[in-house]
Design a protein with these regions (language model features):
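Juxtamembrane/disordered regions of integral membrane proteins
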Residues: 1-149
């Protein structure tokens, strides 16, 4: 069994997280802002103002998504081999956990709408894959050469 190159894994995870954070911010502010307003209205609250602390929470969430995506990629390399195909699968698995099933629990509570869930889930399907591929491209196993499949 080979050892994980933790520095490369963290760098790849950070790159993936930055991609996820930027794309999520742009998407939520520009594409689904009206959907969020409907959720706020349904909850009987005014539109929320983003504060530095609020943005930090989003950054922590996307940091987790990025790091876990690349950690999955690193672990999956043993059975699937290094390369973009494995990165795609790591991105899909992370998407299922974070973007598909995670928000679903908030729909019956009224904190998330079906329309918002579908739109965000569809968008994050693609961004999760792109971020995983970008982060995985930076990963190299400790010691030795490797060939991407």
């Amino acid at each position: 069994m080979t050892k994980i190159n933790w520095v490369r894994m963290l760098v790849g995870g950070l790159v993936a997280a930055i991609i996820l954070f930027i794309t999520d911010g742009l998407f939520h502010e520009n594409v689904v802002a009206a959907d969020w307003k409907l959720v706020y209205t349904h909850l009987g609250i005014g539109e929320l103002q983003h504060t530095g602390l609020g943005v930090l929470y989003f950054a922590v969430f996307d940091l987790g998504r990025g790091l876990i995506s690349i950690y999955l990629y690193v672990l999956m390399r043993a059975c699937c081999g290094p390369g973009p195909k494995t990165a795609v699968w790591a991105g899909v698995v992370a998407w299922i956990a974070f973007s598909l099933t995670g928000p679903a629990q908030f729909i019956p509570l009224g904190f998330y709408s079906n329309a918002l869930w579908l739109k965000v889930g569809a968008f994050q399907f693609f961004t999760s894959i792109v971020a995983a591929i970008a982060g995985a491209a930076l990963y190299r196993q400790s010691g030795g050469t490797e060939v991407a499949t």
